[in-house]
């Protein structure tokens, strides 16, 4: 009897112990070298959230978004961050990509201090920097919004300068362009040096029919991989949620992240730090997945109308399964 009780005690005690390294499931996560997802991955690893969930992250830094997509397609990466538009397009073409929300933080049109530009109509005849290219989703949503609310076609009534986000941010600070539509980390950096927001994408998507803050970006992965490794994907999602909870509440954790945030940014200062932290926190997803999916379906139609098949692929609606509802779907 004593031996049996001792054996039961040992089994119960072992179940309470954290997973050993050899028991963890490895997950390769592809990230842009200086992207904001690094902050979440660093938080997960430093605080042991991955090990506590029985997984071990292998973070793979990459130079371009194309590299993350290629890695996922080739199976050399398990998870990458991308937008639901790409996931939907890939699914329409036969791939089994799917995703869970990463961030609702969106870009904005920023104007310099003391700029005479106060409304979208004031952009007429001006030079507008646009991060990405003519088919960038943020740009096309802004175009749709301007047509609806200000009766201005930004494609024909402004001069666009397309380019990389850091280059356009620098040109805006140098006064070489009148305004810039940039991704949120660069918009936050401009805010830190006195630029103001003319219009944010959060307001744009609401005007176009979204019911809340939309997570355009998500953690994308292959559904077949998730079905074969349910504990791995579930553990990753829980670890990411724990990281977000910590980043939403702990200023000390952000202080620890400063070296990661300031990498490759010679102008990083306290104002930049505060702006990035605030905008990241505002972008932590909080809505139910069904709401995210419903809003994505609405926005998809605007993007299809303005970007055509070059942007959205051959599909006429958001591909079913774009958002991951778990292994029981």
Model-derived features: positions:
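Bacterial N-terminal signal peptides that target proteins for export
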Residues: 1-7
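Secondary-structure end/capping motifs
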Residues: 226-307
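Pocket-lining segment of extracytoplasmic ligand-binding domains
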Residues: 84-85, 166-261
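Conserved C-terminal helix/tail region of periplasmic/extracytoplasmic solute-binding proteins
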Residues: 297-329
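Sec/Tat signal peptide C-region and signal peptidase I cleavage site
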Residues: 17-21
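Bacterial N-terminal signal peptides
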Residues: 7-15
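Short, solvent-exposed loop/beta-turn-alpha elements that line the ligand-binding surface or hinge
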Residues: 52, 202-212, 282-293
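Short, glycine-/small- and polar/acidic-enriched structural segments
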Residues: 22-155, 159-162, 174, 178-184, ...
């Amino acid at each position: 009897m004593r031996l049996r009780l001792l054996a039961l005690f040992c089994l119960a005690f072992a179940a309470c112990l954290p997973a050993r390294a050899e028991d963890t499931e490895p997950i390769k996560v592809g990230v842009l070298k200086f992207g904001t997802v690094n902050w979440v991955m660093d938080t997960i690893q430093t605080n042991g959230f991955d090990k506590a969930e029985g997984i071990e992250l292998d973070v793979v830094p990459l130079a371009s978004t194309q590299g993350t997509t290629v890695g996922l397609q080739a199976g050399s990466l398990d998870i990458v961050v991308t937008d639901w538009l790409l996931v939907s397009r890939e699914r329409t073409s036969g791939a089994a990509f799917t995703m869970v929300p990463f961030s609702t933080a969106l870009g904005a049109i920023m104007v310099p201090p003391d700029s005479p530009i106060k409304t979208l109509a004031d952009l007429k005849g001006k030079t507008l920097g646009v991060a990405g290219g003519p088919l960038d989703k943020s740009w096309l949503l802004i175009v749709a919004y301007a047509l609806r609310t200000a009766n201005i076609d930004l494609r024909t009534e402004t001069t666009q300068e397309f380019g990389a986000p850091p280059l356009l941010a620098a040109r805006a600070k140098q006064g070489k362009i009148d305004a810039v539509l940039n991704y949120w980390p660069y918009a936050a950096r401009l805010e830190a040096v006195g630029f103001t927001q003319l219009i944010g994408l959060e307001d744009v998507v609401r005007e176009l029919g979204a019911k809340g803050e939309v997570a355009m970006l998500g953690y994308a992965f292959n559904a077949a991989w998730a079905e074969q490794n349910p504990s791995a994907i579930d553990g990753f999602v829980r670890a990411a949620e724990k990281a977000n909870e910590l980043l939403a509440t702990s200023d000390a954790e952000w202080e620890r992240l400063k070296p990661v945030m300031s990498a490759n940014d010679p102008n990083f200062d306290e104002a930049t730090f505060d702006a990035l932290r605030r905008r990241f926190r505002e972008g932590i997803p909080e809505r139910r997945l069904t709401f995210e999916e419903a809003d994505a379906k609405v926005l998809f139609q605007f993007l299809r109308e303005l970007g055509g098949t070059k942007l959205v692929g051959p599909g006429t609606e958001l591909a079913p399964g774009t958002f991951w509802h778990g292994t029981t779907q």
